[in-house]
Regions:
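Small-residue (G/A/S/T)-rich helix-start motifs and N-terminal tracts that mark the onset
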Residues: 1-117
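Conserved beta-alpha-beta core of the PfkB/ribokinase-like small-molecule kinase fold
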Residues: 120, 124-178
């Protein structure tokens, strides 16, 4: 233990986890692996942005989008619009983030990463839809718009007064609507 804190080796069992945490097998992410002679370096993965709600059960929302991106070997970024308390039996709570928080997340990703495509999901209210539309309108990348309205268990995930904003502001930006 260094400085009274346990190290990974102190805490790891003498199993495959312990050997996986061996300092000799952990590669410094700042060090690029050596390319075999004559082999081209692998292209970096495409980057996609998902904008939507968080599902605490992990079965929908941005969690599902990020799992899909990973399966497709796409680097996934996210911007949260809402946080839900839900599981396989239903949704017990939905909290919308302020539109300014959504805008800040989208701008943070777009200012640093070359996003090649994006997907929207749950945008609970008119303010979130307007914020997303303002951020997405100038982007010349494919946009998949998924107007999430109701959960699988029947909970409303789009306020009725926001439906027209979806039609007017987001759907015209879409290359694909689900």
């Amino acid at each position: 233990m260094a400085h009274g804190l346990p190290t990974a080796q102190d805490m790891a069992p003498a199993s495959s986890l312990g050997s996986a945490l061996d300092s000799e097998t952990i590669q410094d992410p700042s060090q690029e692996p050596a390319q075999p002679p004559g082999q081209e370096p692998a292209a970096p993965p495409a980057i996609a942005l998902t904008i939507g709600g968080s599902d605490s059960g992990g079965g929908a929302g941005i969690q599902a989008d990020l799992k899909t991106f990973m399966a497709l070997k796409v680097h996934g970024c996210s911007a949260l619009s809402c946080v839900t308390a839900q599981n396989t039996r239903g949704v017990s709570r939905v909290d919308a983030l302020p539109p300014e928080a959504l805008t800040a997340q989208i701008e943070a990703v777009l200012s640093d990463l070359p996003v090649a495509a994006l997907k929207t999901g749950m945008l609970l209210n008119r303010g979130l839809i307007e914020a997303a539309a303002r951020a997405l309108a100038p982007l010349a990348i494919p946009k998949l718009i998924d107007p999430v309205m109701v959960s699988r268990a029947g909970a409303m995930l789009l306020e009725p007064e926001a439906i027209q904003a979806y039609r007017d502001l987001l759907l015209p930006l879409a290359e694909l609507i689900t």
